[in-house]
UniProtKB/Swiss-Prot annotation:
Cellular component GO terms, alphabetical: HslUV protease complex; proteasome core complex
EC number(s) stated in the UniProt entry for this protein: 3.4.25.2
The protein, known as: ATP-dependent protease subunit HslV
Catalytic activity from the UniProt record: ATP-dependent cleavage of peptide bonds with broad specificity
PROSITE patterns named among the record's database cross-references: PROTEASOME_BETA_2
Keywords from the named record: Allosteric enzyme, Cytoplasm, Hydrolase, Metal-binding, Protease, Sodium, Threonine protease
Organism phylogeny: Bacteria, Pseudomonadati, Pseudomonadota, Alphaproteobacteria, Hyphomonadales
Record-listed Na(+) binding positions: 168, 171, 174
SUPFAM superfamilies, per database record: N-terminal nucleophile aminohydrolases (Ntn hydrolases)
Gene name of the record: hslV
InterPro entries on file: ATP-dep_Prtase_HsIV_su, Ntn_hydrolases_N, Proteasome_sua/b, Proteasome_suB-type
Record's subcellular location: Cytoplasm
Principal location: cytoplasm
Protein purpose: Protease subunit of a proteasome-like degradation complex believed to be a general protein degrading machinery.
Length: 185
């Protein structure tokens, strides 16, 4: 799944970044949607609010698959209110064990006032060791830039925007049209 020309590799063509600092959580994504080597759209929104605006969620991967997973996550949050980690683990269990869900191709970052998590189809729910996490083709560039800026910038959004711009300058599957969601924590 690493060849960007392969249509199955479509989930690699994006960047989503989450940064926590000084009472603020910010999640950003680029807007580029690529199919193989073709840019299909430049202003897609890959970050959004769920659970009544209390949780920020971003995705890399097939859009329909991601929305299916967001709906499932919201159902888990209704069952386990204010327990993002528990809901994420329950979603990961379903994603790993239900045949229908196993075919979904997406990665999710979800965050509330207390935690930031990456949820994968392999059944992983990962909480980053640092206050920064990213996914997608430009994710490593954005992550490295954000971690490098973290000690020198006071504002989470400033860190996020600068890091995303660096990723957009390096990764051909990431553009400079950013969607930004913030949450006071």
């Amino acid at each position: 799944m690493t060849n960007p020309q392969d249509s199955k590799a479509i989930w690699h063509g994006t960047t989503v970044l989450a940064v926590r600092k000084n009472g603020k959580l910010v999640m950003l994504s680029d807007g580029q949607v690529s199919m193989g080597q073709t840019i299909m759209k430049g202003n897609a929104r890959k970050v959004r609010r769920i659970a009544g605006g209390q949780i920020l969620a971003g995705f890399a991967g097939a859009t329909a698959d991601a929305f299916t997973l967001f709906e499932r996550l919201e159902a888990k949050l209704e069952r386990f209110p204010d327990q993002l980690q528990r809901a994420a683990v329950e979603l990961a269990k379903d994603w790993r064990t239900e045949k229908y869900l196993q075919k979904l191709e997406a990665l999710l970052i979800v965050a509330d006032k207390h935690s930031t998590l990456v949820i994968t189809g392999a059944g992983d729910v990962l909480e980053p060791e640092h206050h920064v996490v990213s996914i997608g083709s430009g994710g490593n560039y954005a992550l490295a830039a954000a971690r490098g800026l973290y000690d020198y910038e006071e504002d989470a959004e400033t860190i996020g925007r600068k890091a995303m711009q660096i990723a957009a300058d390096i990764c051909v599957y990431t553009n400079g049209h950013f969607s930004v969601e913030t949450l006071e924590i």
